[in-house]
From Swiss-Prot:
Annotated membrane topology: Multi-pass membrane protein
Intrachain disulfide bonds: none
Species whose genome carries this gene: Phascolarctos cinereus (Koala)
EC number, as in UniProt: 7.1.1.2
Protein name in the entry: NADH-ubiquinone oxidoreductase chain 4L
Amino acid sequence: MTSINLNLMTAFLLALAGVLMYRSHLMSTLLCLEGMMLSLYIMLSLLISHFHMFSLSMAPLILLVISACEAAGGLALLVKMSNNYGNDYVQNLNLLQC
């Protein structure tokens, strides 16, 4: 395992630990999720270029588009929560409420 792969896996695991530890605020959770997606994007790009699987060259771009949509949805939820409640506590989310 090269040092680049080790650093990327460490970045992913640190972002995952951040999601699990700092889940009280939505903004910190969204930042950790974005870090996870970016490390996955870089790992997927390196994997495709290392094994010369150029038939999968669109996969990192699709992952990047999905992560951008996820970030936009998360920011929209953050703005809606801050307008309604005045804070970004995840405990204010009630998924059963319309």
